[in-house]
Amino acid sequence: MYPAHLLVLLAVCVSLLGASDIPPQPLNLYQFGNMIQCANHGRRPTQHYTDYGCYCGKGGSGTPVDELDRCCKTHDDCYTEAGKKGCYPKLTLYSWKCGSDGPQCDDSETGCQRFVCDCDATAAKCFAKAPYNKENYNIKTPCQ
C-alpha cells in the first residue's frame, strides 16, 4: 500500500472515531409531529406542544398543570417504559396511517416499533381531546 493511501485510511478512521461521540438526533419526532397533526386535523401547530406546561417538550418535572400536560407526562412515562424494554423510542421509526379517527399503527409492526408507535398514537389522540390553555405555554413558574 502506498503512503498516501495509508494517510487517507488513517484520516477516515480518525473521522469515524470523532463522529462516534456525536449524540444521535431524535428521528421519530417528525413522525410524532405528523401524528399530532393527524389527530387534531391540523387545528393546532405541532410547535405549540413543544414548550407547554411542565412535561410537553424536553424533559419534565413536578406536577402536570392540566389535562394536556398530563398527556405529555403519560407520553414521557411510556417512553421510559420503552427504554426499560430495550427500545430507543426517539430513534425508533414505525409505520402508521392517518385514519378518520386519528393515527393508527400498522398491524404488521411488532416489538419496539409497535410499542413506540402506540405511545405516540395514544399521546396524539390525548392531545387532540385535551383543552389547550394558552397561559400554560412557555410558563415561567418552575415545575415542582
UniProtKB/Swiss-Prot annotation:
Q: Which residues form the propeptide?
A: 20-27
Q: Which pairs are disulfide-linked?
A: C38-C98, C54-C143, C56-C72, C71-C126, C78-C119, C87-C112, C105-C117
E.C. number(s) listed in UniProt = 3.1.1.4
Q: Which residues does UniProt assign to the signal peptide?
A: 1-19
A GO molecular function term, named singly, is:
toxin activity
In terms of InterPro entries, this protein maps to: PLipase_A2 (IPR001211), PLipase_A2_Asp_AS (IPR033112), PLipase_A2_dom (IPR016090), PLipase_A2_dom_sf (IPR036444), PLipase_A2_His_AS (IPR033113)
Q: Name one GO biological process term.
A: arachidonate secretion
The record's subcellular locations are: Secreted
Which reaction does this enzyme catalyse, per its entry?
a 1,2-diacyl-sn-glycero-3-phosphocholine + H2O = a 1-acyl-sn-glycero-3-phosphocholine + a fatty acid + H(+)
One GO cellular component term, please give it: extracellular region
Name where it mostly resides. Answer: secreted
Catalytic residues? H75, D120
Organism superkingdom: Eukaryota
Cofactor annotation: Ca(2+)
Q: Tell me if Repressor is a UniProt keyword of this record.
A: no
Q: A Pfam family in this protein? A: Phospholip_A2_1
Q: Does the keyword Lipid metabolism apply?
A: yes
Alphabetized, the UniProt keywords read: Calcium, Disulfide bond, Hemostasis impairing toxin, Hydrolase, Lipid degradation, Lipid metabolism, Metal-binding, Platelet aggregation inhibiting toxin, Secreted, Signal, Toxin
The function of this protein is: Snake venom phospholipase A2 (PLA2) that inhibits collagen-induced platelet aggregation. PLA2 catalyzes the calcium-dependent hydrolysis of the 2-acyl groups in 3-sn-phosphoglycerides.
Family, as annotated: Belongs to the phospholipase A2 family. Group I subfamily. D49 sub-subfamily.
Q: What is this protein called?
A: Acidic phospholipase A2 S15-109
